[in-house]
């Protein structure tokens, strides 16, 4: 999960910063998209956890993320030139104050904006709520002193490993298109999500 989170962090920033509007979008995304969605997700998570239970909620939550990332990789990203209303945004920039440029860019690059939000929520929901919720439930107080530091070390190793892999993929030369690199990286993310689901099912069945 930490391995996938590091990849998503790098991809979301790359897509947003290099798109129409550039880095001006990030404050708008953080305040007006990520924060409200985080609060909504946590509220929904709290309510559903009382009705569904942790195991069912885990599959529902991670299934939502995997479904969106599949949709983005197969449909939204390849069709971005059609889906992004760049011409309309150029006109809006002429009519609206220049201070709203970042907000207009968020609207223009709405597929990237969704990807940014889901990538941020992956760390907040999948790592913070789902993973640590499972760890707290399956780890005894006696074992926690040994296992929790190992989990922290594992997360750091995963982040470092993902950095090396990202460097290898992005530096693989001009003969591989950026679209192909993104598909490869998203395939890795989806594989991590699938493996996490299988491991979770194995732990719950024991």
Map each language-model feature to its residues.
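Intracellular loop-helix junctions on the cytosolic face of multi-pass helical membrane proteins
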Residues: 23, 50-56, 63, 74-113, ...
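Cytoplasmic helix-loop-helix junction between adjacent transmembrane helices
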Residues: 125-151
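Helix-loop boundary and gating motifs at the non-cytosolic
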Residues: 1-38, 120, 126, 130-133, ...
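Residue-level hotspots within transmembrane alpha-helices of multi-pass secondary transporters
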Residues: 39-44, 160, 164
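Structural signature of transmembrane alpha-helices in multi-pass secondary transporters
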Residues: 33-34, 151-155
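Helix-to-coil boundary motifs at intracellular loop junctions of multi-pass secondary transporters
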Residues: 19, 51, 134-138
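Short alpha-helical transmembrane interface motifs in multi-pass membrane proteins
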Residues: 29, 112-116
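A generic, lipid-embedded transmembrane alpha helix
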Residues: 34-38, 64-75
């Amino acid at each position: 999960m930490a391995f996938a989170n590091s990849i998503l962090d790098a991809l979301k920033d790359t897509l947003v910063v290099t798109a129409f509007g550039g880095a001006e979008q990030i404050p708008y995304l953080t305040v007006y998209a990520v924060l409200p969605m985080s609060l909504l997700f946590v509220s929904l998570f709290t309510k559903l956890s009382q009705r569904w239970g942790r195991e069912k909620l885990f599959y529902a939550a991670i299934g939502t993320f995997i479904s969106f990332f599949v949709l983005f990789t197969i449909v939204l990203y390849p069709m971005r030139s059609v889906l992004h209303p760049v011409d309309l945004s150029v006109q809006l920039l002429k009519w609206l104050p220049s201070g709203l440029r970042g907000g207009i860019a968020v609207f223009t690059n709405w597929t990237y904006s969704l990807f940014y939000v889901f990538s941020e929520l992956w760390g907040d929901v999948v790592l913070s709520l789902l993973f640590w919720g499972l760890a707290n439930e399956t780890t005894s107080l006696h074992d926690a002193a040994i296992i929790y530091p190992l989990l922290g070390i594992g997360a750091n190793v995963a982040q470092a490993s993902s950095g090396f892999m990202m460097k290898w993929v992005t530096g693989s030369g001009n003969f591989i298109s950026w679209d192909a690199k993104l598909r490869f990286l998203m395939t890795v993310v989806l594989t991590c999500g699938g493996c996490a689901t299988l491991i979770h099912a194995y732990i719950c069945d024991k």
